Amino acid sequence: MQLEHCLSPSIMLSKKFLNVSSSYPHSGGSELVLHDHPIISTTDNLERSSPLKKITRGMTNQSDTDNFPDSKDSPGDVQRSKLSPVLDGVSELRHSFDGSAADRYLLSQSSQPQSAATAPSAMFPYPSQHGPAHPAFSIGSPSRYMAHHPVITNGAYNSLLSNSSPQGYPTAGYPYPQQYGHSYQGAPFYQFSSTQPGLVPGKAQVYLCNRPLWLKFHRHQTEMIITKQGRRMFPFLSFNISGLDPTAHYNIFVDVILADPNHWRFQGGKWVPCGKADTNVQGNRVYMHPDSPNTGAHWMRQEISFGKLKLTNNKGASNNNGQMVVLQSLHKYQPRLHVVEVNEDGTEDTSQPGRVQTFTFPETQFIAVTAYQNTDITQLKIDHNPFAKGFRDNYDTIYTGCDMDRLTPSPNDSPRSQIVPGARYAMAGSFLQDQFVSNYAKARFHPGAGAGPGPGTDRSVPHTNGLLSPQQAEDPGAPSPQRWFVTPANNRLDFAASAYDTATDFAGNAATLLSYAAAGVKALPLQAAGCTGRPLGYYADPSGWGARSPPQYCGAKSGSVLPCWPNSAAAAARMAGANPYLGEEAEGLAAERSPLAPAAEDAKPKDLSDSSWIETPSSIKSIDSSDSGIYEQAKRRRISPADTPVSESSSPLKSEVLAQRDCEKNCAKDIGGYYGFYSHS
């Protein structure tokens, strides 16, 4: 008999619905069909002896005392079991099907009964977000705010989204379908049941693509910058959707509503409420996706990204009104995704059932700010946002941490469909560990005090996305592999202190460089790619040229990491002219490189632009024209004020120990040439 219940629960439900209160004809049944639905509606006026409870116990074959072991039988739990027998039964289903994940989705139920009009429709899977219910927000009235539940009731689409709707649509929640258990690893997946009476195919299932990244920010309370001109969100909203009618047309848009009625402030290292929110703000709160309207096949074919959505605090913003969402600082907001089926002519008809679907992901909540308050959020933005160049210019002067490890990307955490450089730099072992020493601040050398963002001090170049410039980004839908030129095992970037002593070391490094072309690396023609993808110069030399790591962003660059070469002969000439020591030892340099390239022996002693010390294929940028920057980098590395002088026996290139004053003067000249070819990017 129990097997019959499991195989055909809809048949049993149709027989038992007569015993359920008539005002909730489909609510309990819809939750029962979704066996793994963790968000259960609290229906206080269900009959205490509802046969649904008996059905669920028969399906799970559990006794009345076989509840969650972690519930501790608190008074709230007892009250919950008395108030909602449907919840009690389905929670056992969660325990049977999902095992250890069940305790994450215990419903926080108030110990006092609430009416059906004010009871929260569902819950957030985060204990800190449980709270009293508030009047729900309507899209037509921005003055209302959102209650603590994923689907908004009493709104413009109440007849379609409420649990007590005559159509009987189930509440959109966080079910974890069995077929997605391994590929998505428990990501939020909204689903409408197709077995519900009256439903037809075309009900959406939505997946938040970059949920791991959102959760990282959510742990520290996400903050979003708002400006007068408008600022894009990071992380941005990105969804995958399925279950639509491929031939029907849909509008997909996002609106941003108040998540609670409080005004917030950052005090004592945490966000605390301070007063009531201002609910009289007028302005656009809706952002329509640029592809709307479009067919269901189009929406399901690709990721739906809202990366161009901008947040502003300009209440009178009339231009670009379609891209601007007007918010208030120090208020907490909740984005929502709406999928609306439209007619052939593109007009919306919300009066028909099933045409509007709304999805809310609580981990996308954020507090609007004009400046970041939490340094943890700032560091997360630096680590994951490849376009946060303003932070990298000023972060080490604004905040206390100056050592280099505050600017490193986080390895092995590249989320899906989010352009982050984290996995690009996931190197093995000591190559990462020895890069950024604690005395980096002592070795810093800035071109000027208080350098701000600008073309002359663009420090965001090394933080681009591996080999790819932003214009060369591949399909963001898959996790990004490592994108280094060479593998950690064959890495020749960590030169020894005497790397320039013998031709053998240079020949080995030249062979490594030549192997790039054989691998078909597209970003190696540096003249075409510019300097937007500088993976070779990102990490400092771990062991060579002294005990300290060289400054990463100043002119005294290490020749061992081969920074981005100048893309024109004019830039090379400027760099050569800025260093008077380059011409003095040009003859010696050409003579020492002769075993590598016989053509360099008859080169002009004073003209390094003609010294071809390596044979390069046609696919690589010619070193004859502008490769004097390599020797220039070696010389500038030697005269860096932060370096320890190398003994005469270990470096044949060394001629003398320069005075500190001369070092500063020459480095200042070198910086101008070094940043000259970055100004165009």
UniProtKB/Swiss-Prot annotation:
Family matches, as PROSITE patterns: TBOX_1, TBOX_2, TBOX_3
Composition bias, Polar residues: 58-68, 462-472
Cellular localization per UniProt: Nucleus
Presence of the UniProt keyword Lyase in the record: no
UniProt keywords, alphabetically: DNA-binding, Nucleus, Phosphoprotein, Transcription, Transcription regulation
Segments of skewed composition (Low complexity): 108-122, 618-628
Cell division keyword on record: no
Region Disordered, residue ranges: 43-83, 108-127, 447-483, 597-655
Primary location class: nucleus
Observed phenotype of the null mutant: Homozygous mutant mice do not nurse and die between postnatal days 1 and 3. Brains are smaller than those of heterozygous or wild-type littermates, olfactory bulbs are small and olfactory bulb projection neurons are absent. Mutant mice show severe defects of cortical development.
Modified residues (Phosphoserine): 410, 594, 640
Tissues with expression: Expressed in the developing and adult cortex. Expressed in the olfactory bulbs.
Function: Transcriptional repressor involved in multiple aspects of cortical development, including neuronal migration, laminar and areal identity, and axonal projection. As transcriptional repressor of FEZF2, it blocks the formation of the corticospinal (CS) tract from layer 6 projection neurons, thereby restricting the origin of CS axons specifically to layer 5 neurons.
Quaternary structure note: Homodimer. Part of a complex containing CASK, TBR1 and TSPYL2; may modulate gene expression in response to neuronal synaptic activity. Forms homodimers. Interacts with FOXP2. Interacts with FOXP1. Interacts with BCL11A.
Protein name: T-box brain protein 1
